[in-house]
Amino acid sequence: MLLIGVAGTELSAQERDWLQHDAVAGVVLFKRNFASRTQVAELSAAIRAAAPRPVLVCVDQEGGRVQRFREGFSALAPLQSFGAQYAHDPESALAAARAHAQLMASEVRASGVDLSFAPVVDLGRGNRAIGDRAFSDDPQIVATFTRAYVQALHGAGMAATLKHFPGHGTVLEDTHVDHASDPRPLEVLQAEDLVPFVAGIEAGADAVMMAHVVYPQVAPEPAGYSQRWIEQILRGQMGFCGVVFSDDIGMAASFSAGGVAGRVHAHLDAGCDVVLVCHPELVAESLQAVQGRSLNTAALIGLIGRGALGWDGLLAGTDASFTTPPSAHFGTTA
């Protein structure tokens, strides 16, 4: 299955045709697709109306610098702010993170979008792309926040997606623009980077997004292209039974598999259920690549947002005392 990107704030005729394709699982939205709360709700409805089957509408609404919907939405703090707060007041930090998850999920769901790819559970150890998107550099602290965040997302009717497996935070390179390799052995990764993923899976996380990072002591290819990582470790050893997303095939670190078709096939052959094709100019070739493939469609139904939510009532279950914690001002509108 493919999760595709579209060009603007309304669907074109070609994009409506794409949504008719059996291989299209849904659409991932970006800043380019957003003008207002009303507009994004209308776009979400148009996406669903164009598809002959239930589809996902997704976004990255993590908070901080990765927040695609801003005007009319709460200004969400980066996750690192909760880790900083945890050092001197663990309970209030966890409460604030739960409120952050509930608020984010409620606003996204009230806009007709099923899920935000969250939470980031990478360790915050200097990666250029991760930075303040991570809770902490400490695996146990990240694991604690992961459990709380997953549970809060579920409470707001949103599926939880752990990213970026098996851990993107320790390499320096940004895989959007460069290849990245982590030389550590599996035993070290299991003791550090995998700890939050274990916690999230135990908490009932619904999906995992793969990293485009190579871990040469474990497998020679990027994790998203690796049966060793997906089938043997994530599913076999860690017992994960949910949906596996690739990261975007337009990122530089994905180019090791060759052209667009090669990247799509490499992800699906490795065990990914859904391949992210975020750049509209790559969609047609990606759809051609999956012709004739057997695709996992049933697994995606569980990711569709649960329960209809109206914007006016979205904060009904949120404790007002957590809307503006001292280290995380996410209760104001952008």
UniProtKB/Swiss-Prot annotation:
User: Which positions does UniProt annotate for substrate binding?
Assistant: 60, 68, 133, 163-164
Q: What InterPro entries does this protein's entry cite?
A: Beta_hexosaminidase_bac (IPR022956), Glyco_hydro_3_AS (IPR019800), Glyco_hydro_3_N (IPR001764), Glyco_hydro_3_N_sf (IPR036962), Glycoside_hydrolase_SF (IPR017853), NagZ_Beta-hexosaminidase (IPR050226)
Q: What is its EC number?
A: 3.2.1.52
Which pathway, per its entry? Cell wall biogenesis; peptidoglycan recycling
> What does the UniProt entry say about where the protein is found?
Cytoplasm
Any Pfam family matching the protein: Glyco_hydro_3
Query: Where are the catalytic residues?
Result: 176 (proton donor/acceptor), 247 (nucleophile)
Q: What keywords tag this UniProt record?
A: Cell cycle, Cell division, Cell shape, Cell wall biogenesis/degradation, Cytoplasm, Glycosidase, Hydrolase, Peptidoglycan synthesis
Task: State a single Gene Ontology molecular function.
Answer: beta-N-acetylhexosaminidase activity
Q: What class of enzyme is it?
A: hydrolase
GO annotation, cellular component aspect: cytoplasm
Q: Which reaction does it catalyse?
A: Hydrolysis of terminal non-reducing N-acetyl-D-hexosamine residues in N-acetyl-beta-D-hexosaminides
SUPFAM superfamilies with a match to the protein in the record: (Trans)glycosidases (SSF51445)
Q: Provide the primary localization.
A: cytoplasm
**Which residues of this protein are annotated with the site description Important for catalytic activity?**
174
What does the entry give for GO biological process?
Answer: carbohydrate metabolic process; cell division; cell wall organization; peptidoglycan biosynthetic process; peptidoglycan turnover; regulation of cell shape
Q: Superkingdom, according to UniProt?
A: Bacteria
Note the HAMAP family from the entry.
NagZ (MF_00364)
The protein's role, per its UniProt record:
Plays a role in peptidoglycan recycling by cleaving the terminal beta-1,4-linked N-acetylglucosamine (GlcNAc) from peptide-linked peptidoglycan fragments, giving rise to free GlcNAc, anhydro-N-acetylmuramic acid and anhydro-N-acetylmuramic acid-linked peptides.
Q: Hey, which family's this protein in?
A: Belongs to the glycosyl hydrolase 3 family. NagZ subfamily.
- Stored PANTHER family: BETA-HEXOSAMINIDASE (PTHR30480:SF13), BETA-HEXOSAMINIDASE-RELATED (PTHR30480)
Quote the protein name from its UniProt record. Beta-hexosaminidase
| Source organism phylogeny | Bacteria, Pseudomonadati, Pseudomonadota, Gammaproteobacteria, Lysobacterales
Gene name of the encoded protein: nagZ
